[in-house]
Amino acid sequence: MQKDLHPKAVPCKIIYQGQVVMETMSTRPEIHVDVWSGVHPFWTGEERFLDTEGRVDKFNKRFGDSYRRGSKK
């Protein structure tokens, strides 16, 4: 078997918006992330509501009853 085939694991800092949010082991000394669990709405419990009623109205306005009846061939 070959020696030193695998890269060495070193302490790694996970960086979010210029701040170290976590330390772990990796082959890279730093990893910059755009989103992490500390700010993601799913993990923080923050709810965001989409304007689904507006989407339905837009769909009905565009297609009307023709979608429900099916296409006539």
From Swiss-Prot:
Keywords for the protein's UniProt record, in alphabetical order: Ribonucleoprotein, Ribosomal protein, RNA-binding, rRNA-binding, tRNA-binding
GO terms classed as biological process: translation
Transmembrane intervals: none
GO molecular function: rRNA binding; structural constituent of ribosome; tRNA binding
Highest taxon in the source lineage: Bacteria
An example Gene Ontology CC term for this record: ribosome
Keyword flag tRNA-binding: yes
InterPro entries the record matches: Ribosomal_bL28/bL31-like_sf, Ribosomal_bL31, Ribosomal_bL31_A, Ribosomal_bL31_sf
Function: Binds the 23S rRNA and interacts with the tRNA in the E site.
Family: Belongs to the bacterial ribosomal protein bL31 family. Type A subfamily.
The protein's assembly and partners: Part of the 50S ribosomal subunit. Contacts protein L9.
Protein name: Large ribosomal subunit protein bL31
Species whose genome carries this gene: Deinococcus radiodurans (strain ATCC 13939 / DSM 20539 / JCM 16871 / CCUG 27074 / LMG 4051 / NBRC 15346 / NCIMB 9279 / VKM B-1422 / R1)
